Amino acid sequence: MGNRVICMKKKDVVIRSGGDGSRSKRVNRSQRKLLADEENLHRRALSMAIHQAQVSQRFDGSMSRRIGSTSSRRGTLSDSFSNNKQVPEFLESLKVKKFVLVHGEGFGAWCWYKTIASLEESGLSPVTVDLAGSGFNMTDANSVSTLEEYSKPLIELIQNLPAEEKVILVGHSTGGACVSYALERFPEKISKAIFICATMVTDGQRPFDVFADELGSAERFMKESQFLIYGNGKDNPATGFMFEKQHMKGLYFNQSPNKDIALSMISMRPVPLGPMMEKLSLSAERYGKGRRFYVQTLDDLALSPDVQEKLVRENSPEAVFKIKGSDHCPFFSKPQSLHKILLEIAQIP
């Protein structure tokens, strides 16, 4: 398939104001309400993260979570956008309205809080999942040794969908490997797969291989990295890794708001190493028939634009979208641009 490349404007939203002063006041009030809603959402996400950090009991390992919007009622497609513009009528005809959001390494469902609110405001149905050993899933990350174990909450969510229901699967960073794994297993359940600065690997490739330019080869990383965790003791192979906070700030959040960095610093958890080092088996008959889309982040220091471009060349998706000014976490640094792209992909026939 040929690639389509769409480059989002650096400014998330452009509001055109006419000569009507009253309209300008309404827009300003709308903007203030949007900021207040976002602040409220952030407080709720922060509260959940603090609660997570204090949890001492263990929960069932297959937990999926939803972080609701600030609205007291569920939005519909006929509701207005936050800028007082009517939602396009063609959204009413969308056959697939459920988005399953899959976080990347160290993150959890909490990282999608802005995306969840925006999708719900548009009348869509976002669902998040905590992968094994991540977010509110209290599985010990040191015990997660395979991609199958890591992806189990996502696989169970897809397996429990109604027979005729399909979803749009969205993966961030190494969550892209889980998306690929799910696409190989359930191509009939996944309408579209969206990779956000993600590890869109080829058959026989490891998720870690995508980061080799930044972190060195897997073999070198396993021998020399200071970020490795030895959950079973130094005499046994490493079980996970975790970047230092200052390292993460510069690597992941170079364009993100301070409040989202603070949320991440108390929420991120160690990353299971086994799934990152596992080679994926992807077939042309199943994975190859899936509809894949890639979102590039052009100010990304964790997965450079050059590496993302290489991924697109080697594993060609149906279309490519680019977000200017976004770091490795566009759901924090450019949430409105990301939202527009998700809507646009949902509307592609």
UniProtKB/Swiss-Prot annotation:
EC class: hydrolase
Assigned EC number: 3.1.1.-
Primary subcellular site in the record, as a coarse category: plastid
Keywords noted in UniProt: Chloroplast, Hydrolase, Plastid, Transit peptide
Name of one Pfam family that matches: Abhydrolase_6
InterPro entries for this protein: AB_hydrolase_1, AB_hydrolase_fold, MES/HNL
Domain of life: Eukaryota
Cell compartments where the protein resides: Plastid, Chloroplast
The protein's name: Putative methylesterase 12, chloroplastic
Organism: Arabidopsis thaliana
